[in-house]
Amino acid sequence: MKYLCVYYQIIRKVFWNMKTFLFQGDSITDANRDDENNDNFGMGCGYAFLLASEFERNNKGKIKFINRGKSGDRITDVYARIKEDIINLKPDFMSILIGVNDVSHELTMNCGVSPEKFKKIYGMLIEEIRESLPEIKIIILEPFILKGSCTEKLWEEFNAEVRKLAEISKQVAEISDLDFVPLQDKFDKISSDGDTRYWSVDGIHPTSAGHQVIKEELHKVIENYI
């Protein structure tokens, strides 16, 4: 199935001149997608689905969206998938939302990724993608955190560490001259009344309303390309 998908991307570019947008990240991007059927349920039920629905509806035959977010992924896991789930798909545009698992896995299972390693691997990821796909446009989304059932017991640690990776994500974008989509301040503002559960199920995973917020912020950047 995956080989057919790669072949389809090549045919699409050569004969139809259709652009491809790739979503990459962890469970927030994955959003329960069906990884065996990307044309139907493969977008999941999150911000990737919301964004793809709008742009594909208004740009028929011009752009195709693919979701390769994977639940549980850290930056090291995305890097490990660089060939199969990024380069081989030959996307023209790509967004990445990663970082919260690098923190949560460390705090809860002692198998996360340190800020120093996060920055190094993120930089390597961007560099190697550009070496293979020099024309690609990459957008980095800021990892974010809210207080919820998954984060409240270690809230100070979660909050501090995720914000460190958020700043590093911004630095990686600046160093590589990439578009950066800030999200933490947005979620802080809209949840300032203390009702974080309206925006996030557990402090990590967005609700439908939370996914809509991510979609709207990413939309502001993508509309400059499409």
Task: Tell me the role of every PLM-derived stretch.
Residues 70-75:
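Functional beta-strand-loop-alpha-helix junction segments that form "active/interaction loops"
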Residues 2-69, 82-90:
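Serine-esterase "nucleophile elbow" of acetyl-processing enzymes
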Residues 53-61, 77-226:
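Alpha-helical cap/lid subdomain in secreted, periplasmic
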